[in-house]
């Protein structure tokens, strides 16, 4: 029987700090094995109740063991919320969503989806925002008082009421007295309440924007800013867990320059979204060069490229998706092709250095089964019926591969990569079709992708998605709140620790020595063009959606990379470009070290750590809830 514990101290820390739920009856946090038991306990009951389907014991054992041994991973949203939270609201099991801002309801629906921990892609393209109504010419104070109930539904309904009144020129008062104080534990969903102040800030922000838009429709940048402000208020225990991508027209100058100059001084909410231009056809060279130069000048990879024509062609390629009448969008990491008002769940294959074609095929089969189980979550509260309709029709999966650079078969150094990827994709499709038929649901319309895999790769100790390892040896730093019992326990257990230089009074920084597998590829081993060629192989031969990647571009490579992107534009989407940096700073998440420094730190790590003693430090729920930033390249620390 596999161990109930994870193999390394770092992996144990990631589980306890990110995914472990508080067990009030036992007065402690879950073990790794108990987290997995909770996940399967939920799905066994859910599938039986909703579909009359019982998971065979032999299959359940195989799936449980594969997760215990970190061979595959389910949706980390499901892993976090399985139980009462997921039963109460199925949205909380999803990683990704997309919505066009073409209806007034889009704003409160986005708030509700984000509050469930799901990442949101949204579009403020003019063909959508032009459908919004005209704002009133004049504004008058109203006697109406919006009383906000202390729940996700309460917050969403209150925002809906406020926006509705602002459109007709009435400025109501609001009563936030029922909202729990900041820091109050959230029993069902986990984590801690953010208090009334963020919602008050959002309401005032909306009033100001609407007053400036009197007598006309909201502009794209105004809609963008409202959505960003909505995301900014969705915080739990100081952990931002909102992820956004904003799509705008290529010709939209205001959105192109949304992050130009000292934008953070006056428009801090814009930090919450990654921005991409939406291409509906291949641009001419002049337009492309202008946008490429703006991306280069930004030093932050913005605006990124979302190619809707490419996404539509990709969606149609497998013959299982009805693309007619759909203007596709994407999720914050840009690996899933989504209809307006649609969710996607993710699951993951973890590639190990010793994996063979046979073991990879088995992992793909099991990861597709998990995704198929998760695709039965179609009971959504509050949001419009289109969300449930789209999910029930398409049953999208996002079966991803992480650790690609750790194995010569998957990183292209050995064997025929294209042939292997085709075989793996066919196995995923077949696995889904078989299990979907047994459950009694439609086959999924699209199945395979590559996600950035930030927190998951940390949990399982693998290279992130299709990204290279940092270095053969490196030090990984992670932060802990000094009030958190886990931090206090680790300090006393003797983990290497120092005060956070930016916040010494409240935050500790722990260091973990890390060693990459011997056949791994490192970030200095590949040129930007080589990274793109590997990405293209996965796009053509593995993905029914898209592979998400962040390409590190050296200063002398920008012209060549721009040329490659233009030449391969029909495939482009899901790629971010950032300047390659050797620059490191104090307490950076990844720090290069040599073998001697690695061995020295390894010898200083505490031995035989008994994580169960954490229970003696914590007498009530101090978990901070869903720290996984639903899905965002910025949150993945790649």
Where would I find each of the regions flagged by the language model?
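Extended catalytic cores of very large enzyme megasubunits
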Residues: 1-638
């Amino acid at each position: 029987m596999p161990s109930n514990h994870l193999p390394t101290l770092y992996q144990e820390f990631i589980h306890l700090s990110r995914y472990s739920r508080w067990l009030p009856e036992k007065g402690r946090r879950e073990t790794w094995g108990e987290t997995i038991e909770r996940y399967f306990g939920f799905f066994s009951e859910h599938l039986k109740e909703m579909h009359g389907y019982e998971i065979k014991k032999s299959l359940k054992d195989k799936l449980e063991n594969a997760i215990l041994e970190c061979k595959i991973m389910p949706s980390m949203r499901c892993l976090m919320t399985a139980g009462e939270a997921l039963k109460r609201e199925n949205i909380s099991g999803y990683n990704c969503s997309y919505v066009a801002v073409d209806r007034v309801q889009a704003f409160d629906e986005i708030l509700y989806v984000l509050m469930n921990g799901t990442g949101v892609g949204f579009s403020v393209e003019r063909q959508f925002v032009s459908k919004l109504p005209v704002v009133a010419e004049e504004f008058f104070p109203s006697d109406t008082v919006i009383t906000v109930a202390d729940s996700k539904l309460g917050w969403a309904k209150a925002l809906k009421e406020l926006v509705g009144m602002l459109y007709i020129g009435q400025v109501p008062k609001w009563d936030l007295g029922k909202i729990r104080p900041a820091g109050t534990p959230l029993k069902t969903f986990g984590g801690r309440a953010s208090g009334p102040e963020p919602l008050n800030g959002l309401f005032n922000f909306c009033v100001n924007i609407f007053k400036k838009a009197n007598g006309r429709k909201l502009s794209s940048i105004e809609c963008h800013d409202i959505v960003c402000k909505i995301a900014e208020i969705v915080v739990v225990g100081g952990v931002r867990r909102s992820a956004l991508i904003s799509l705008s027209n290529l010709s939209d100058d205001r959105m192109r320059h949304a992050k130009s100059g000292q934008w953070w001084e006056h428009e801090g909410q814009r930090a919450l979204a990654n921005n991409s231009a939406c291409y509906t056809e291949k641009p001419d060279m002049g337009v492309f060069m202008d946008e490429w130069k703006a991306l280069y000048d930004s030093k932050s990879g913005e605006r990124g490229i979302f190619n809707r024509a490419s996404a539509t062609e990709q969606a149609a390629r497998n013959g299982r998706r009805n693309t007619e009448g759909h203007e596709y969008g994407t999720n914050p990491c840009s690996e899933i092709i989504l209809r307006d008002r649609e969710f996607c769940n993710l699951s993951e294959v973890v590639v190990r250095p010793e994996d063979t074609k046979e073991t990879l095929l088995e992992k793909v089969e099991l990861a597709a089964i998990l995704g198929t189980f998760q695709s039965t979550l179609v009971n959504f509260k509050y949001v419009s019926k289109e969300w449930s309709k789209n999910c029930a029709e398409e049953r999208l999966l996002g079966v991803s591969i992480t650790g690609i650079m750790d194995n010569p078969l998957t990183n292209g150094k050995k064997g025929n990569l294209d042939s292997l990827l085709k075989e793996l994709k066919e196995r995923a499709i077949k696995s889904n079709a078989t299990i979907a038929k047994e459950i009694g649901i439609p086959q999924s319309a699209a199945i395979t992708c590559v996600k950035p895999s930030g927190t998951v790769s940390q949990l399982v100790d693998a290279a992130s998605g299709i990204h290279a390892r940092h270095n053969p040896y490196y030090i990984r730093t992670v932060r802990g709140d000094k009030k958190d019992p886990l931090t206090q326990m680790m300090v006393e257990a003797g983990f290497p620790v120092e005060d956070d230089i930016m916040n010494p009074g409240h935050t500790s920084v722990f260091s973990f020595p890390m060693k990459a597998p011997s056949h791994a590829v490192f970030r200095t081993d590949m040129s930007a063009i080589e990274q793109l060629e590997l990405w293209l192989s996965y796009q053509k031969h593995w993905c029914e959606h898209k592979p998400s990647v962040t390409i590190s571009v050296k200063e002398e490579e920008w012209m060549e990379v721009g040329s490659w992107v233009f030449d391969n534009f029909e495939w482009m989407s899901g790629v971010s470009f950032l300047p390659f940096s050797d620059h490191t700073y104090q307490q950076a998440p990844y720090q290069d070290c040599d073998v001697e420094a690695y061995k020295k730190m390894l010898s200083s790590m505490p031995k035989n750590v008994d994580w169960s003693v954490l229970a003696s430090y914590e007498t009530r729920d101090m978990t901070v809830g869903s720290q996984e930033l639903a899905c965002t390249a910025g949150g993945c620390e790649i």
